[in-house]
From Swiss-Prot:
Enzyme Commission number: 1.14.13.9
Native source species: Aspergillus niger (strain ATCC MYA-4892 / CBS 513.88 / FGSC A1513)
Gene: bna4-1
Classification via SUPFAM superfamilies: FAD/NAD(P)-binding domain
Keywords tagged on the record: FAD, Flavoprotein, Membrane, Mitochondrion, Mitochondrion outer membrane, Monooxygenase, NADP, Oxidoreductase, Pyridine nucleotide biosynthesis
Protein name per its UniProtKB record: Kynurenine 3-monooxygenase 1
Length: 475
């Protein structure tokens, strides 16, 4: 068992997975969580806005499988609902229409799961490790990066003094409103770009017994807003209304909630949600704003590193928030922190790259940990900034793109090439993001390259058609 001590702030899914990675490596692990034991697996708090249904995709599944916890990924997947595409609902000529759009031509699926379900599975896995200690109802009150000392206060016992704990590495996994990030900014020159998007959301529930298919996500898109429904294993559908703030304010002031849903989301009420229940849910459930956070760097020396929403909070429209956080954990440990366990070979591995950069090779484990955390920031930041942007773009695509002919033409061409000419390596952007684990920077590079090729082919065909028309006129 190693004496290296890792303190993790935040016991949500990303923090819990980081705890598993650290525990499997024999580190002494302490996890501090502000909420009650398992309260986060029972309900979302009013301020947390964590109740949006989650989807596991390949990046997250790979991180679970690489945790070295036998059968963990399979146990979690057994509690999910596989979804193979979207079903777009609309009204055409006064008739309700539904169109299924598969995510992937190869039949791959996303896996819908509640935040509470996956959090509980990870916390239960952690409880089996003797080198892991979890402290609930503890808030981070202070952080001394120089002395590597954190101060926590038990908020269930406010009369008791705060207690200090030493660490070798502190991992901040405490979400978008990260206290770790706040204290880190006192030491590191962190650039933080925080933007409240004009996107509010409200959760609604479609009771079990409905006739909607459970193997897809359901959408009712409009130009400026949309309704989204995700299946739960209990047979219900968790819905989220996404709209600008002015839409919510208008609905609250006018009270015309039923009329709004009947006009814009055909088939919802009274067929799926009784009108009185719809009004009750809309009025009683909170209306949350959405935030986009991007920061850099993610670390300070060899003392602290941010992961998950603490480093990069994104809107949920690509379903990659948790998956990206899980991928943070895998990359941080496998590609960087694991190297500290073999200091001499680590120095050997670094020698060539340092010689090429004409830099002096660090001569202590602490200096090398600091260097690799710096490299982690440089490696990871471009990727997560891209997925933050892609998530925002996908909100526009979900509302408007699904009705555009150009969207479906490109999708069909790319899927045809992916299926019938796999040697070309062609794939849709969605497949590269959700069903592959290539870097997001490489995803964007490939998608742009494919777009340029398709544009060149389209313009060439148009030019050829024009020339043939001219030739036929002369003849």
């Amino acid at each position: 068992m190693s004496s290296y001590k890792v303190v993790i702030v935040g016991g949500g899914p990303v923090g819990a997975l980081a705890g598993l990675y650290a525990a499997q490596r024999g580190f002494q692990v302490e996890i501090y969580e502000m909420r009650d034991e398992y309260s986060q697996v029972q309900t979302a708090t009013a301020f947390s806005a964590k109740s949006i249904s989650l989807t596991l995709s390949e990046r997250g599944i790979k991180a679970l499988r690489h945790s070295q916890c036998r059968g963990l990924a399979e146990r979690i997947l057994s509690t999910t609902v596989p979804v193979y595409g979207r079903m777009v609902h609309s009204r055409s000529k006064k008739r309700l229409t539904s169109r299924r759009i598969a995510y992937d031509v190869h039949g791959q699926a996303l896996y819908a799961i509640s935040r509470s379900e996956i959090n509980q599975s990870l916390l239960e896995e952690l409880s089996a490790f003797p080198n892991v200690h979890i402290f609930y109802k503890h808030r981070l009150n202070g952080l001394d990066m120089k002395q590597k000392c954190a101060t926590f206060h038990n908020i269930s016992r406010p009369q008791e003094p705060s207690h200090e704990t030493k660490f070798d590495l502190l991992i901040g996994a405490d979400g978008a409103h990260s206290t770790t990030r706040f204290f880190l900014s006192r030491y590191a020159k962190i650039n933080i770009n925080q933007k409240w998007e004009d996107i509010f959301w409200c959760e609604l529930t479609i009771p079990a017994g409905h006739a909607l298919p459970m193997d897809c996500l359901h959408m009712w898109p409009q130009r400026d807003f949309m309704l989204f429904a995700c299946p739960d294993k209990e047979g219900t559908l968790t819905c989220n209304l996404f709209a600008p703030e002015n839409v919510f304010l208008e609905l609250k002031s006018s009270g015309r909630i039923v009329e709004f849903f009947e006009k814009n989301f055909p088939g919802i009420t009274p067929d799926l949600i009784p009108t009185d229940n719809l009004q009750k849910q809309f009025k009683s459930n909170l209306h949350h704003p959405m935030i986009d956070i991007r920061c850099s760097p993610y670390h300070y020396q060899d003392s602290c590193v941010l992961i998950g929403d603490a480093a990069h909070a994104m809107v949920p429209f690509y379903g990659q928030g948790m998956n990206t956080g899980f991928e943070d954990v895998r990359i941080l440990f496998e590609d960087f922190l694991d190297q500290r366990r073999s200091f001499p070979s680590w120095k050997d591995n670094l020698s060539l790259s340092y010689a090429m950069q004409q830099k002096e090779l660090p001569d202590t484990p602490q200096a090398i940990v600091e260097d690799y955390l710096e490299q982690y920031t440089k490696y990871r930041q471009p990727d997560v900034h891209i997925i933050n942007e892609l998530a925002l773009q996908n909100y526009r695509e979900l509302r408007q793109g699904v009705f555009k002919m150009s969207y479906h033409i490109r999708k069909h061409i790319e899927e045809f090439l992916s299926l019938h000419a796999p040697q070309l390596g062609w794939a849709t952007q969605y497949r590269l993001v959700a069903f592959e684990t290539m870097r997001y920077t490489d995803v964007l590079r490939q998608v742009r390259k494919q777009g340029l090729i398709l544009s060149a082919v389209a313009w060439s065909c148009l030019l050829l058609f024009f020339l043939l028309c001219l030739l036929s006129l002369r003849l």
